[in-house]
Structure formats: C-alpha cells, structure tokens
Amino acid sequence: MRSRSFLVLVVVFLICGTLVAQAAGRIRRPKGKGTKKILALVKGQGPVRGKDQVKGQGPVKGQDLGKSQDPVKAQLPDKGQDLGKGEDSVKGQDPFKAQLPDKLQDPVKAQPAIKRLILLTKPGSCPRILIRCLMVNPPNRCLSDAQCPGLKKCCEGFCGKACMDPK
C-alpha cells in the first residue's frame, strides 16, 4: 500500500514539474506562431547581435560610415546653393525657407478619436476569477471594453483577457 501511494506522489510531482517547466520556459513553440529571438546577456559582455559581419556585406562604396545623414536636411538646399533645372524663384521668397513646413503637427495629438476609443469603459465590474491557467503570457481576445460587443466588458478571464458579461 505504501509503495503504491509513493508511486502516485512521484507521478503527480513529475506532472506538476513538467507543467511548471513548460509554463516558465516555453521550451517548444509551433513554427511561425509568435516565435521571437531573445538575446541573452552574460555578465561583463554585450549583446552578440551585430558583432560579426556576414561575408559579402560591407559598407556601400562611396558612403561615409562616420557621418549619418538626416533625411530632412538632405532634401533642403544650402543657403548659397543655386536652384536646380526647371525650378523658378519666387520674388521676395528665400528658396531655403520655401521648402520648410509652416506648422508642425504633433502626431499623438492628431488622433484624439483613437485615444477616446481606447479609454472608453462600459458600466459594471468584471466577474471574479477563482482559477487561472498556468500559461506565462496567455493570449488576449480583447484589450479594451470598446472591442467587446453590446454590454460586455473586456475582463481578465481564466486564461487571458476576454469579453464577459459584467456583474
């Protein structure tokens, strides 16, 4: 009787250990489904990426590696530079200032509708979840209440976020 219960305990511990190892390490993943390469840093060493050149890959001929070009500045003519062929000068206008934009628009402030959509919360509270899955990073079916149909809310569920009926 004792040996049988001992074997049952050993099997239970092996199964639990396997589940924890899979959840913590994610040893194998299906090809093409969210696989990411992770750089491991060793104490005293930098990341390995980009140290060795691949054969046949070198700097482009005629390109200076020390100086980086700003794409905006590269398009603007110098103040003393003449206009190119086919370009007419406007009287009283400096050709250098003519190519600068009048007003710069902040891309974050240009999208207030999206910001309001994400922050929209529906009334009610999420149901309490008693049991959770063991996945380290479970997949989410929604990110905000706005993505859920009707009165449903985006809540933390059994395994990741999902649309649920509120309390």
Curated annotation (Swiss-Prot):
Q: Which UniProt keywords apply?
A: Disulfide bond, Protease inhibitor, Repeat, Serine protease inhibitor, Signal
Q: Name one GO molecular function term.
A: serine-type endopeptidase inhibitor activity
Q: List the disulfide bonds.
A: C126-C155, C133-C159, C142-C154, C148-C163
Q: Name one GO cellular component term.
A: extracellular space
Q: Which InterPro entries match?
A: Elafin-like_sf, Trappin_transglut-bd_rpt, WAP_dom, WAP_four-disulfide_core
Q: Which residues form a coiled coil?
A: none
User: Disordered: where is this region?
Assistant: 46-104
Q: Where does the record place the region 12 X 6 AA tandem repeats of [GSAL]-[QEK]-[DGLP]-[APSLQ]-[VGDFI]-[KR]?
A: 44-115
Q: Where are the sequence repeats?
A: 44-49, 50-55, 56-61, 62-67, 68-73, 74-79, 80-85, 86-91, 92-97, 98-103, 104-109, 110-115
Tissue expression pattern: Trachea and large intestine.
Q: Which residues form the WAP domain?
A: 119-167
* Region annotated 2 X tandem repeats of SVP-1 like motif, chain positions: 78-126
Q: What does this protein do?
A: Neutrophil and pancreatic elastase-specific inhibitor of skin. It may prevent elastase-mediated tissue proteolysis.
Quote the protein name from its UniProt record: Elafin
Q: What is the native source organism of this protein?
A: Sus scrofa (Pig)
